[in-house]
A protein has these predicted regions:
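N-terminal basic/disordered segments at the start of proteins
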Residues: 40-66
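A short acidic Gly-Thr/Ser loop motif
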Residues: 49-54, 175-181, 260-264, 346
Length: 365
């Protein structure tokens, strides 16, 4: 679920050709030619996150000690569909990704983006044809994707969410439930800077090699019985156990959970009885154990058609949301924190903060 526009125009065949001029990517982060965009008003930065399930873009400009979003895009593309079974990105998934990336390229061009970082995560890490896919994106779209490792993914998610850490808390357990992997990060109280958002203080992290897409494909996401749900929880719990043992219960004093993912924003939307997704109400929302349990029980009582009909779920997430709940449940059982703060932010915001800090836009380098 996302509060951003889901553009879905038909692709002009001409857009399948790489654009003339410079390409965006990790190795081309400098200023772009002056004729690339007419939307001025300070330097524009772009952060793109191509995940197993979603393609997401944020374009922003520095504003005060943070930044202002000037354009955004989010589309569920299921790039990693079938990768866990076949080991390859399918042609249909590649076409969906290229269509979404073409829209992102045009948005960056229209906003006159001067610096960008375009990351790809688990689907491209795991697929044997990931390099071939990236070469095709460079050729057809003109974008150079950077495949990041799991530690970088965890760090960027933490950087993007640090502003939601309760300043009265000793720290937080951040989790990011993705399509193909899920990250858990122990955060100590954040460190204030001379300018810009606070810096995350990471005590430890782990990346689990599964997410909502891989778990739903393995167990089934359409008809989820209580036994199937518990099997999903048990599989995730076994992967979490070593990390939970390392960071035992004593560390939970003064800690809250901080969740970023479509799973937790969906749960928050259901909890708030939203008829239409509203990021302003979801981002930063607090939920306690009783409220989380009530939503999960409600979702488990729904059949597939009920989930499709829910304005907070819809057809794009109806077969994935219970897998996400199972991952969340395994995390909660391992780390029984009484409060959860919901974040509709994460990797892209972390990328933007990192680039702007490197450029010294908040008065430091």
């Amino acid at each position: 679920m996302s509060g951003e526009a889901r553009d879905n125009p038909g692709l002009d065949p001409a857009l399948n050709r790489a654009p003339e001029g410079p390409r965006w990517g990790r190795r081309s982060l400098g200023r772009l030619d002056s004729d690339l965009g007419s939307d001025r008003g300070g330097p524009s930065y772009a952060a793109l996150d191509l995940g197993t399930n979603n393609c997401r873009l944020l374009v922003a400009r520095p504003a005060g000690e943070s930044f202002r979003v000037v354009d955004a895009f989010s589309r569920i593309i299921r790039l990693g569909e079938g990768v866990s079974a076949l080991g390859r990105l399918s042609e249909a998934a590649i076409e969906r990704a290229i269509a979404a990336l073409t829209i992102c390229r045009n948005k960056m061009k229209n906003k006159g983006v001067s610096r960008a970082r375009l990351i790809a995560t688990e689907a491209c890490r795991a697929a044997e044809n990931g390099a071939e896919f990236r070469a095709r994106v460079a050729e057809e779209v003109g974008l150079e994707l950077e495949v990041i490792n799991r530690e970088t993914e965890a760090t960027l998610a933490a950087t993007g969410c640090t502003m939601l850490l309760d300043p009265q808390a000793e720290g937080a357990l951040l989790f990011d439930i993705g399509g193909g992997s899920s990250e858990l990060v122990w955060l100590d109280r954040s460190q204030k800077c001379n300018g810009g958002p606070p810096l995350p203080q990471i005590r430890g992290w782990v990346s689990l090699p599964l997410g909502v897409v891989t778990l739903a494909e393995r167990h089934g996401g359409v008809s989820v019985t209580p036994a199937i749900y518990e099997a999903m929880v048990s599989e995730v719990a076994a992967l979490i156990a070593p990390f939970a043992h390392e960071h035992a219960a004593a560390a939970l004093r003064g800690i809250h959970m901080l969740g970023t993912s479509g799973t937790v924003t969906t749960i928050a939307g259901v909890h708030l009885n939203l008829k239409r997704y509203d990021r302003r109400r979801v981002d930063g929302c607090w939920m306690d154990e009783r409220e989380i349990n009530a939503v999960i029980e409600r979702l488990l009582s729904m059949n597939y058609q009920d989930r499709v009909a829910s304005p907070c779920i819809g057809v794009e997430r109806a077969d994935l949301v219970l897998a996400g709940c199972a991952i969340l449940e395994a995390i909660r059982r391992a780390f029984p924190c009484p409060r959860l703060r919901v974040a509709d932010r994460g990797l892209r915001e972390g990328i933007l903060v990192q680039m702007m800090r490197e450029d010294g836009v908040w008065g430091e380098h």
